[in-house]
Amino acid sequence: KKIIFLKKYTSGQATTVSKALKFLKNDQIVIVHSCDLNFKINFREIKKKLKKYDIVVITANGKEFNYKNSNQFSWVRKNSKSKEVEISLKKNFITNKRKNRVLVGSFIFKNNEILNKSIKYIMRNKLKVKNEYYLDHAVSISKKIGFKLGEIIVKKYRSWGSHSELKNFK
């Protein structure tokens, strides 16, 4: 375990994570988790998903706060034809808004190499959203660069990332 101190602000979650990549082994599983939320997850399910997918996004059913502030979140759904995971960055999909899931900001990568390639792709191509490099974006392009994307829907998801969520947190 290692704590890395950054000397200046970064341009987003993906940029921050990229600072730690050199400390990780290429073949080890990498879990990136936002600090302003929690949920329960079954680790056996993670192992099972990583046998099938290179990257797994953690999602939850949206709450009223998410729907009212949908542009603060990325959204996930399964394509009705291909059954592949699709991500809409910082806005909900136009159709079936209440059936789409909110991307909670936690990600699992089969290994460091996959994470590194995903981040490098968005940075090399200057793919920013709201002037930041988001991991949401790095995983949304996973198919384009040859990776399989899966999803785990968690229950008991709690977030305190916004002022109103923190104020109402119990």
Label every PLM stretch briefly.
Residues K47-K48, S80-W160, S164-K167:
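Catalytic-core segments of class I nucleotidyltransferases/pyrophosphorylases
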Residues K170:
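Catalytic core of nucleotide-sugar-dependent glycosyltransferases
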